[in-house]
UniProtKB/Swiss-Prot annotation:
<dbReference type="Pfam" id="PF00830">
    <property type="entry name" value="Ribosomal_L28"/>
</dbReference>
<dbReference type="GO" id="GO:0006412">
    <property type="term" value="P:translation"/>
</dbReference>
<keyword id="KW-0687">Ribonucleoprotein</keyword>
<dbReference type="GO" id="GO:0005840">
    <property type="term" value="C:ribosome"/>
</dbReference>
<keyword id="KW-0689">Ribosomal protein</keyword>
<dbReference type="InterPro" id="IPR037147">
    <property type="entry name" value="Ribosomal_bL28_sf"/>
</dbReference>
<dbReference type="GO" id="GO:0003735">
    <property type="term" value="F:structural constituent of ribosome"/>
</dbReference>
<dbReference type="InterPro" id="IPR001383">
    <property type="entry name" value="Ribosomal_bL28_bact-type"/>
</dbReference>
<comment type="similarity">
    <text>Belongs to the bacterial ribosomal protein bL28 family.</text>
</comment>
<dbReference type="GO" id="GO:1990904">
    <property type="term" value="C:ribonucleoprotein complex"/>
</dbReference>
<dbReference type="InterPro" id="IPR034704">
    <property type="entry name" value="Ribosomal_bL28/bL31-like_sf"/>
</dbReference>
<dbReference type="InterPro" id="IPR026569">
    <property type="entry name" value="Ribosomal_bL28"/>
</dbReference>
<protein>
    <recommendedName>
        <fullName>Large ribosomal subunit protein bL28</fullName>
    </recommendedName>
</protein>
């Protein structure tokens, strides 16, 4: 299973570790993914999603229904 957010499509980025002497080595910035259950009151059911912590903040701000609708329009969910 790839480490990708189900709703936003966020995935790992590539960057550099930079030492004090400015030596650079490649590294990967992973996404902070959390397996979380959300309640859909319209459908009266729970869904389990693997989402980034930043996406959970967005869901708390905008609501799960609005975020699901946006993810569907952007093609992240069917």
């Amino acid at each position: 299973m790839s480490r990708v957010c189900d709703l936003t499509g966020k995935r790992a980025m590539v960057g550099n570790n930079v030492s004090h002497a400015m030596n650079k080595t490649k590294r990967k910035f992973s996404v902070n993914l959390v397996k979380k259950r959300f309640y859909l009151p319209e459908e009266d059911r729970w869904i389990t999603l693997r989402v980034a912590a930043s996406t959970i903040k967005t869901i708390n701000k905008n609501g799960i229904t609005a975020v699901l609708k946006k993810a569907q329009s952007e093609g992240f969910i069917k």
